Every structure is written in C-alpha cells, then in structure tokens.
C-alpha cells in the first residue's frame, strides 16, 4: 500500500502595530507546502513494515520579519530581520513489527530522522566594550534529530502467565545556534 500527497495551504496574515513611534500595517500572503508519503507492507497477518515521510513548511513570525530596532534598553537591543526565509522540516519514520501467537512472542524496531533547513535562531552579538548585546533572528542550518528503538515481549511459560518485556530507546538531537563577540 503506497499513498502520497501534497498539501498547499495558503496563509494570509495581517499585522498592525504601533511600537517605538513606528506604525506598522502590513499583510503577508504565503503558501505553505507539505508533501507526504506513506508506504505499508504486510509480510503476513502478524508481520508488517511501515515507512512514512512528511515535509512541513513554517513561516517566520511577523514580528521577526519587521525591520525595527528596539534600543530602549541599550544593553539588550533587539532587531527584526526582513530577509528571513521559511523553514522546512523533513521527517522519515520507519517501523517493523512481528508477533508469533503460538509462542506469544512479539517484537518491533522503529526509527525516526528529522532535519530542518533554514531554522530560525536568535543570533546574539555581544559587545565587550559596552557589555551590551544585540539579538536578531537569523536562518541557520544543521538542526536534526534521530531516534531508534525497539521492544521484545515473550511468555516464559506455556500458560502465558509469566512474561518478559524489554525495550530500548536511543535518541540524539543536534541543535545549532549563533553567538558572536564584537
């Protein structure tokens, strides 16, 4: 069984703000793109494989996109970034499971990998002379995570009263960030 699809989601955002003497009245029209793929295969009634892919687009917040510098606190200045790009996350998940009824035995293995291009991270630039910092949202690459796991269950007696259940999960997250010193 194989299915796939693409979702195109139009989004209209209106933003009105008066801040630090700056009047902002803007509209953003975007289309978020989200492809999917799902593959399922049954080896038998009790044994199956599934692989799933999903892509997701996320837009930067309207406030992050505004070209406004807030220096009301000279030690903690914030800036917007009108050049921010949308982020796109891709995820792949796979799992395999099997159950043998005559032995009351079951096991499964599964895994997931996800990566995001153009993630949005706050870039903090520290000024050693003033002790102040400037924070500005920026796109960054290199964020990803992985997860694998599995379980095993079985009866150790013929009546199925005594069972052994065990599982193992491992995960790793890789997050990138910015830090600059002037």
For each predicted feature, which ranges?
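Exposed, low-structure sequence patches enriched in small/polar residues
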Residues: 1-182
């Amino acid at each position: 069984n194989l299915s796939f699809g693409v979702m195109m989601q139009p989004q209209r955002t209106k933003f009105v703000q008066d801040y630090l003497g700056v009047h902002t009245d803007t509209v953003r029209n975007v289309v978020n793109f989200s492809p999917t793929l799902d593959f399922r295969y049954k080896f038998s009634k009790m044994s199956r494989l599934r692989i799933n892919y999903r892509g997701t687009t996320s837009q930067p917040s309207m406030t992050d996109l505004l070209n406004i510098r807030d220096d009301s606190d000279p030690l903690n200045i914030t800036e917007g970034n009108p050049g921010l790009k949308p982020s796109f996350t891709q995820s792949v998940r796979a799992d395999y499971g099997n159950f043998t009824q005559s032995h009351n035995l079951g096991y499964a293995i599964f895994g997931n990998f996800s990566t995001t291009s153009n993630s949005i991270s706050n870039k903090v630039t520290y000024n050693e002379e003033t002790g102040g910092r400037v924070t500005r949202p920026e796109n960054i690459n290199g964020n990803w995570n992985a997860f694998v796991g599995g379980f095993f269950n079985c009866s150790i007696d013929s009546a199925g009263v005594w069972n052994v259940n065990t599982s193992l999960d491992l995960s790793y997250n890789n997050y990138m960030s910015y830090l600059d010193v002037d």
